[in-house]
Amino acid sequence: MFPHRVSHLSKLFSRRFPNWKRKVQTDSWSNVPEHIHSKIGRNLFQKEGHPICSLRQLLEQQFQKFEMNNVQKESPIVSVETNFDSLGFPKTHVSRSKSDTYYMNNKTCLRTHTSAHQPEEFSRLAKEGFKKNGFLITADVYRRDEVDSSHYPIFHQMEGALVWNRNDTAKMKNDLKKVALSPSLKSMVDDETTALETHNDMQDIYSLEETKFVSQHLKDTLTTVIHDLVSLAPSISSGAEQVRYRWTYDSFPFTKPSFQLEIDWKGKWLEILGCGVVQDRLLKGAGLNNYIGWAFGIGLERLAMILYGIPDIRLFWSLDERFSKQFLPNKISTFKPFSKYPACFKDIAFWINNDFNPNDFYEIIRDVCQDMVESVNLIDQYTAKSGKTSLCYRVNYRSMERSLRNEEIDKLQEKLRNRVANSLRVELR
């Protein structure tokens, strides 16, 4: 991926992360850059008072009545089999690409979702004799992505699941009645997913009645949890704003049917979470025979940006006390921006080859410039008569913590140009 680094990684050797205790064998698949290495072990979801930690704690409180195991997964290193194969991802799935996933080597990677731990936690329920009805997993996850104010290569998810024995229909019906009594369900909700029988998106092993029960329990529960959480935001609790929700269909390899919950926030529909009825093969593989259940995954940064009014996802990783001292544990408060430093725009244009992937370009920018780039936008695309294609990107340099000097930016831009040319084998213009 980055030839000037991979050349010395092709020979297996042990590498110890700066913030991690575990030795990892690397090979030609290794594509984890230093700016990612340095953040492993920061564990923002355990840092008391940090918005991500507070959001985790508030969500755990919301789900407390369901008697679930609360799990925090510190090590992000998982096997490729755990991250993809066990959940039913096809071998050709785009998310397996080195342009999408950070690989330690050809057999291990940095988890791309908390769903990687579902099989392990389902097995735990069975081994412990169903002392708990489900689980909540919180962890940091890693994906190569674009550069802007709402995307970052490391973010945090909470995964949750709840199961029932299919023979205990009385408990299933009673549980549904309980969640259906929630006054939060009176909030404005549009549901486009009621006609499951006509959508042809059910598992053959489950009856229509079972599928409808689990789907409704899932939607009622999550609507209540998210509504009650969002109501803690100062702008909502004061009555200054109203919130609407809607359910739509989605698709995931490990749930069927699958849904997503969206929130109408300031006139724009935003996806808050994905969820669905757990695939029976996952439950059986974990020793949960004749069980049915639901699962969901929430991106904590997306929710925190809404609730706290945090405008830039980079701020979650800031060490600036002007950020960290604004927040108290288990409390949602509105972020107060500190001085916004001036921006500086620099353009970079190049002729691409057939192997070019934008995520590889974005990764180089993050590795060279760290968190000093606010956004990267494609501003021009041109195809010559020869068939060659040229792209021009605008790089917006802006630090969250200090003013950047012109000479500093010029040096970064020159370093970036050299890395792009050498690593991506493109022709600079």
Curated annotation (Swiss-Prot):
Residues involved in substrate binding: 115-118, 143, 150-152, 157-159, 271, 296
InterPro entries referenced in this protein's UniProt entry, alphabetically: aa-tRNA-synth_II, aa-tRNA-synth_II/BPL/LPL, Fdx_antiC-bd, Fdx_antiC-bd_sf, Phe-tRNA-synth_IIc_mito, Phenylalanyl-tRNA_Synthase
Keywords: Aminoacyl-tRNA synthetase, ATP-binding, Ligase, Mitochondrion, Nucleotide-binding, Protein biosynthesis, Transit peptide
Keyword Lipid biosynthesis: no
Pfam family, one: tRNA-synt_2d
Cellular compartments annotated: Mitochondrion matrix
Gene3D superfamilies the record matches: Bira Bifunctional Protein, Domain 2 (3.30.930.10), Ferrodoxin-fold anticodon-binding domain (3.30.70.380)
Family classification: Belongs to the class-II aminoacyl-tRNA synthetase family.
The protein, known as: Phenylalanine--tRNA ligase, mitochondrial
